[in-house]
């Protein structure tokens, strides 16, 4: 069975980059009728917070990305310890004691010599007495996985054939000196034991994937299918990492972005398929094809979400917004008309409140000095509400006959005086929704 996972760390709020990874894995699982696991990578006790776990679930629920089960890495530490013991027994795990300063000096020396900054495995030459002395001086060391210096290859679902020389990669640290299990080994153990068949993540994980393939093999397992999607950049190609604080999913939700607008964009961004507003997750899943995505960095502009949201709302039937409109105080008899009139003139649902305020209380008249007498006379000819479908036509015909004005000179001053706006819905519809007679 196809099984995928989304494995966020609860150290902050989800952002659009996280969503891309979650959505791809979700759609692969759902398209195949498989399992989608939400795995909370909470092995860092200092940075992992319960409120972020709650926020992750809240964001995914808002988007409709439902999971089949949830796992917590903090509850699986015994499994990682067993894997570490197995690697030690196989001679693939060793303790190292260099300080960050020492490692930095080694890196600089290698770079100055024109060599790749790869850990030199000096710790392998330490005797047991030397290790004991270093532990007494510095505390417990880190535990590194000893890579086989051979080429690691796989066929990537997006990038194609990948080949990485393990000799050009440092032996990865899997357990810190304080005992904290790091992502690399925890992810390997979880992916194998949970039966994960497909892993889709950002292209910044390519080297990490190579080392994980070797770790899986050392533990006696094959590896899932891997695919690495491109990283998002800002609209000018700038690094998105500097702007992620403004691109948290909770912030986009607060700004009124519709879930399907966000999902529609993220499901196609970076692919050869055009971005189209989908009416449902099922429609997105049906059209999803990982092979259409490329390796080039993908530009993301949050401004694109607003016209997509507007387009989605313009096609939304009244039944889906009836409760929201009732909550605004719109009379039931006028609620559906209000939606039909307002929806073509809103960008987000929050704009509905402004339109109802205009219809309920009237707009702030926008009247040029030379039009003031004309508007005053026109308003005097308008009866009290309620107004019907014929009110605008009958009223403007009477005003036209009395003033001699016609065309834009007739209609625009009246629109601006009634609504305070130069453009908007058809005035015949506006009049039907007005709750009070306009005044200057």
Swiss-Prot record:
GO BP terms, alphabetized: glutamyl-tRNA aminoacylation
Cell compartments where the protein resides: Cytoplasm
Reaction equations catalysed: tRNA(Glu) + L-glutamate + ATP = L-glutamyl-tRNA(Glu) + AMP + diphosphate
NCBIfam families: gltX_bact (TIGR00464)
'KMSKS' region, short sequence motif: residues: 239-243
Similarity comment: Belongs to the class-I aminoacyl-tRNA synthetase family. Glutamate--tRNA ligase type 1 subfamily.
GO molecular function: ATP binding; glutamate-tRNA ligase activity; tRNA binding
Chief subcellular location: cytoplasm
Protein name: Glutamate--tRNA ligase 2
PROSITE patterns (UniProt xref): AA_TRNA_LIGASE_I (PS00178)
Pfam family, one: tRNA-synt_1c
Record's function text: Catalyzes the attachment of glutamate to tRNA(Glu) in a two-step reaction: glutamate is first activated by ATP to form Glu-AMP and then transferred to the acceptor end of tRNA(Glu).
Source organism per UniProt: Dinoroseobacter shibae (strain DSM 16493 / NCIMB 14021 / DFL 12)
Designated gene of the protein: gltX2
Lineage: Bacteria, Pseudomonadati, Pseudomonadota, Alphaproteobacteria, Rhodobacterales
Complexes and interactors: Monomer.
Motif ('HIGH' region): 8-18
EC numbers for this chain: 6.1.1.17
The entry's keywords: Aminoacyl-tRNA synthetase, ATP-binding, Cytoplasm, Ligase, Nucleotide-binding, Protein biosynthesis
Top-level taxon in the UniProt lineage: Bacteria
């Amino acid at each position: 069975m196809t099984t995928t996972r989304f494995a966020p760390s609860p150290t902050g709020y989800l952002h659009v980059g996280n969503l891309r990874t979650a959505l791809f894995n979700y759609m692969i699982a759902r398209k195949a009728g498989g399992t989608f696991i939400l795995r909370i990578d909470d092995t860092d006790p200092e940075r992992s917070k319960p409120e972020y776990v709650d926020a992750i679930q809240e964001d995914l629920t808002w988007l409709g990305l439902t999971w089949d089960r949830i796992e917590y890495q903090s509850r699986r530490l015994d499994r990682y310890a067993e894997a570490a013991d197995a690697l030690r027994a196989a001679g693939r795990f060793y303790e190292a004691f260099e300080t960050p300063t020492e490692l930095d000096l080694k890196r600089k020396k290698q770079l100055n010599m024109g060599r790749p900054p790869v850990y030199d495995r000096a710790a392998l030459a330490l005797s047991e007495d030397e290790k004991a002395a270093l532990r007494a001086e510095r505390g417990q060391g880190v535990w590194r996985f000893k890579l086989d210096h051979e080429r690691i290859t796989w066929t990537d679902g997006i990038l194609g054939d990948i080949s990485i020389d393990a000799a050009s990669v440092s032996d990865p640290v899997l357990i810190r000196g304080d005992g904290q299990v790091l992502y690399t080994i925890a992810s390997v153990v979880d992916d194998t034991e949970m039966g994960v068949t497909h892993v889709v993540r950002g292209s910044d994980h390519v080297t990490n994937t190579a080392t994980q393939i070797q770790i899986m093999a050392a533990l006696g397992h094959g590896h899932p299918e891997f695919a690495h999607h491109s990283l998002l950049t800002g609209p000018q190609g700038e690094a998105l990492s500097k702007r992620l604080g403004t691109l948290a999913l909770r912030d986009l939700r607060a700004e009124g972005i519709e879930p399907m607008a966000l999902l529609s964009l993220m499901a196609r961004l970076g692919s050869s398929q055009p971005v189209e507003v989908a009416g449902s997750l099922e429609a997105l899943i049906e059209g999803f094809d990982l092979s259409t995505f490329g390796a080039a960095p993908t530009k993301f502009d949050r401004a694109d979400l607003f016209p997509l949201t507007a387009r989605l709302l313009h096609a939304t039937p009244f039944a889906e917004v009836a409760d929201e409109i009732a909550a605004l105080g719109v009379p039931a008899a006028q609620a559906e008309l209000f939606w039909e009139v307002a929806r073509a003139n809103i960008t987000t649902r929050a704009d509905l409140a402004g339109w109802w305020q205009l219809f309920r209380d009237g707009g702030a008249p926008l009247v040029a000095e030379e039009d003031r007498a004309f508007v005053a006379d026109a308003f005097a000819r308008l009866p009290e509400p309620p107004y019907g479908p014929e009110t605008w036509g009958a009223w403007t015909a009477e005003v036209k006959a009395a003033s001699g004005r016609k065309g834009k000179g007739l209609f625009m001053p009246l629109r601006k005086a009634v609504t305070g706006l130069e453009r908007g819905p058809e005035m015949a519809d506006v009049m039907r929704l007005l709750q009070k007679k306009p005044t200057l």
